[in-house]
Amino acid sequence: MNLTRNFLLAIVILLTVSPAYATVYQYFDEEGTLIVTDNPFGTKKPTPRPDIAYPDIKLRYRDDVSYDFYPVTGNNFVELISSTNLNGPLDPADRKKYAGQTKWNTGWSYAFNSSYTIDGTYMYVSLNILDIEFMSDISVLLPVLQDRTTLSNYDLILWDHFVQKLLEHEHDHVKIVKDPVYKDEAVKKISAIKQLRLAYNPGDNLDTLIKGAVESETLRIGHDLIMKIKQQNEEYDRITDHGLQAEMSAAFFGN
């Protein structure tokens, strides 16, 4: 009887508390691929090309977005649109060029503490994930005139209107990325991670093992989240024909 009792005590280690909190940083590109880890500053924000200045028109910029510009030239509005079609950014999804482009990375940081029970070859982990914070880096690429002096006032009015409508379309993509519904869903799923069962090896560093397992769980959540955002962006471009049918924007957002 005592031998059996001692044997059971040898294979079951009762509750052990992890000695410290752990902090995780995860950032994802538009394909849901992990691009930065253990970096409290997130991804590096893009900076505008030094040889390209902000357009000499009043556009409604956002403080939470970075802007970059590519040059276009022409003697009238039609030539400017042709230059935009020639020099605009390439969409890797359909290999077509468009007048504007929104690029984004998003992710989060969170802290967690843990306790665990080891039973034979398995470790049963109890988790408390907290302090979940979201971060995103969003950049918008727009065309900018190299020389406004060669254009008539009428062509300038047409061009300025075109760029403003283009910016509004790209800002709708920003709106999709920043929709709080995705943040709320992710927080709910991350916070729901309360228990893990992990294979245990006596030679393992338990803190490293637990942290890696938690990161794997939230990595899956992050990938699924990015895929939903990407799908919404693609659907928005489909419905609005990449901004050519701007009147469909209100229907998409339910306004």
Task: Name what the model sees in each region.
Residues 8-16:
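Bacterial N-terminal signal peptides
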Residues 159-174:
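Short alpha-helix carrying the canonical HExxH Zn2+-binding catalytic motif
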Residues 171-188:
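Catalytic Zn2+-binding segment of zinc metalloproteases
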Residues 192-201:
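RING-type zinc-finger domain of E3 ubiquitin ligases
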